[in-house]
Amino acid sequence: MSESKLNLFSFSGKTRILHLSWFAFFLTFFMWFNHAPLIASIREAFDLTDQQVKMLLILNVALTIPARIIIGMLVDAFGPRRVYSILLFTSSFLCFGFAFADSFERLAMMRFLMGFVGAGFVIGIRMISEWFPARQVGVAEGVYGGWGNFGSAAAALSLPTIALMFGGENGWRYAIMLTGVLALVIVALFLEEPEGHMAEVLPDGTVQMIEVT
């Protein structure tokens, strides 16, 4: 890690971890707010009242603050790669549960539990700090935070169109299911990566433990 500049166009070693991390963060926000741009269709499907819609929006963020503390503790105990993988895996099935919901109560429960996905950004901060030296960590975390936060905007821009492409009264369900599928893809990619604690991936795929300075 002797280079002083970060090559963002590289897709190997620590830069690959950066790209996986920001996309994982992106997906957490994409899933966390996947219901918001589709709320009109959800309201129509379940004949929701204004109060019920407000409740779904509130429940979606209710767990986030305690979740960030809990996720931080888990990262300290088990490492960021494992925790990110588990969070995305669990959140994908919460997306499926929301998409297949057949009552307001089921919708509300899934949205409440989805508050945990808002803690995803905590994991990446730790992961980036482990993979990048001090002279690069600021830029790396800027890329991580900047692109990751775009997830909620991307959901608002893309999911209504995706729902229309699927068509029919269940288009919104398929659009939300798709966000869960994307999360599973990232989980599979994460599980192929090394733990990364002060590590450098060599060209032959082996991991060399080094001191990050």
Where are these regions (language model features)?
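Extracytoplasmic
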Residues: 16-50
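Residue-level signature of mid-helix packing/kink "hotspots" within the transmembrane helices
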Residues: 33, 61-69, 119, 153
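Conserved MFS/SLC helix-loop-helix module at the cytosolic interface between two early adjacent transmembrane helices
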Residues: 66-104
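MFS-fold secondary transporters
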Residues: 94-98, 114, 190
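Short hydrophobic/alpha-helical segments at membrane-entry points of transmembrane helices
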Residues: 103-111
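Cytoplasmic helix-loop-helix junction between adjacent transmembrane helices
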Residues: 110-147
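Helix-loop-helix hairpin linking two adjacent transmembrane segments in secondary transporters
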Residues: 144-196
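Flexible cytoplasmic inter-helical loops of multi-pass small-molecule transporters
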Residues: 191-213
